[in-house]
Amino acid sequence: MTDALMSASRVVLRAGALVPWLVLTAVVCAGVVLVDLVSAFFASAAFVLLGPLLPIAGLGLSYVPSVNVDYQLVVASPYSTLRLLLLRAAVFVALAAPVLLFCGHRLEGVQFGARVLAHTAAVVAVGLAQSTLMAPTLSAAVVSFAWMSLVQVVLMAGGLADITSSHAVALAVCTAVAALFVLVVRRRALSTDWRYS
């Protein structure tokens, strides 16, 4: 009986580690729907601005000890830093994919959601590659700021169609591939400061 209660409490604690990310996802979804009621353009722009930040925010938050209840287990794990980083990134992209596809379909169709998902993969890949220079939490913050700045510049210079065009998606895919190549080449330079903080 006691073992069953202990294992159930562990499951609840592990599920509790996703609460900040789930709240962030719910806020973004609610914001997209709310803005969609006001104006379709602003909803799409907000979705393109905030959608790709969901996985990178989750990845950055997962390396904060006060948020992640399994932090000590990760620190003591025998796996390489590259493997831990890639597994976490894959989990957060997989969790964000249905949300992005659903909201994209709600706004402008399935293609729109898939194109935003391509940008999401590029943002996460650049964040992973940048983790070879700094801690994953700082890397996530820097990449998020860079993405928001890039979207603002493109929206001011052109329009939403420029961000979701096939050329922009091809550039995002090439950026993701190049960033993952940099990550693999520089894997020995991955910051491990988070393991000892």
Give, region by region, the residue ranges found by the protein language model.
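Short helix-to-coil transition segments within interhelical loops
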Residues: 75-81
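Juxtamembrane helix-entry segments on the extracytoplasmic side of multipass membrane proteins
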Residues: 48, 167-170
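Secretory targeting signals
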Residues: 40-68, 86-152
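Short, mixed-charge, low-aromatic patches
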Residues: 28-30, 55-58, 80
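Extracellular/periplasmic helix-loop-helix junctions in multi-pass membrane proteins
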Residues: 156-168
